[in-house]
């Protein structure tokens, strides 16, 4: 099989409609012998800002010395852009090998009336590739909602909901509260809080469903205060962060160097 044939096969899966649930993605993961069991996953959901948040997170983790997988959507030019390891896109050969491996199984599923969607299959392509590359951490951008998204086939060690707004109401719900509740399902197990920039009714719904929540915002009511001072020059931007228990002005909190370096690198790449 050639690369262009593999990609054409994947794109052809777009004809299948999205069905809420992770059962199909879980079945494909099982068929692939459950890749990703040893990977620590970070799941990024939200109505806006998912992609940039995922990339910021990946940048900080890489600066901290981890090998990091990044899964985002959509792509601009090639499918390979969606799946990266340490800043390098997945290879053509890996995509072709994956499609050769799963194509017969996917055809049988479709013939039985249980087809998988493009997003479900590409999500598992990412997880499979991250496993083969032996990454330490993988950052997954949620496609739609959270509870029934293919990325929820894994159990994250950390997750966030950037914002919540009315979107995809036919699938996620008719109100902000319903949509927030669906997104809250990405919350990690245990005592790790769900991180969010949501406010108002959305924040209340997230707290009600996810339990402990760490809020991020631009005012003093947030647990983590972020100030963005705009573009300082044509190549730089300035960001200040204040964490609980410290003040950015008096240096009450000491941040790991990788945190600042990762934010700086990601901001420069975006400009």
Predicted regions: what they are:
Residues 22-37, 63-154, 170-173, 178:
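ATP-dependent carboxylate-amine ligase catalytic core
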Residues 140-141, 161, 196:
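Redox-cofactor binding/interface segments in oxidoreductases and associated redox assembly factors
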Residues 137, 158, 193:
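Short, Asp-centered acidic motifs that coordinate Mg2+ and/or phosphate
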Residues 152-163:
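Inter-motif core of Ras-like GTPase G domains
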Residues 57, 126, 206:
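Aromatic/hydrophobic pocket-lining residues that form π-stacking "cages" and hydrophobic walls in ligand
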Residues 52, 148-150, 168-170, 203-204:
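Glycine/Thr-rich phosphate-binding loops of Rossmann-like dinucleotide-binding domains
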Residues 1-46, 53-66:
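Short functional linear segments
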């Amino acid at each position: 099989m050639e690369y262009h044939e593999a990609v054409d096969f994947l794109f052809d899966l777009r004809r299948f409609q999205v069905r809420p649930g992770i059962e199909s993605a879980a079945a494909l993961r099982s068929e692939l012998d459950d890749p990703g069991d040893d990977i620590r996953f970070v799941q990024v959901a939200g109505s806006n800002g998912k992609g940039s948040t995922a990339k910021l997170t990946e940048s900080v983790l890489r600066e901290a010395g981890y090998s990091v997988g990044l899964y985002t959507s959509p792509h601009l030019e090639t499918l390979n852009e969606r799946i990266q390891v340490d800043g390098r896109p997945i290879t053509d050969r890996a995509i072709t090998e994956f499609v050769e491996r799963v194509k017969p199984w996917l055809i049988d599923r479709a013939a039985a009336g249980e087809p998988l969607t493009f997003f479900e299959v590409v999500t598992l392509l990412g997880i499979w590739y991250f496993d083969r590359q032996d990454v330490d951490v993988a950052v997954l951008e949620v496609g739609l909602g959270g509870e029934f998204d293919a990325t929820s086939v894994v159990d994250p060690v950390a997750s966030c909901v950037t914002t919540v707004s009315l979107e995809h109401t036919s699938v996620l719900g008719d109100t902000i509260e319903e949509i927030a509740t669906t997104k809250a399902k990405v919350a990690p197990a245990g005592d790790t809080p769900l991180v969010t920039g949501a406010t108002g009714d959305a924040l209340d719904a997230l707290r009600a469903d996810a339990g402990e929540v760490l809020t991020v915002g631009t005012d003093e009511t947030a647990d983590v205060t972020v100030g963005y001072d705009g573009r300082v020059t044509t190549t730089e931007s300035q960001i200040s962060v204040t964490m609980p228990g410290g003040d950015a002005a008096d240096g009450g909190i000491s941040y790991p160097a990788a945190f600042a370096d990762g934010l700086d690198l990601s901001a420069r790449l975006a400009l």
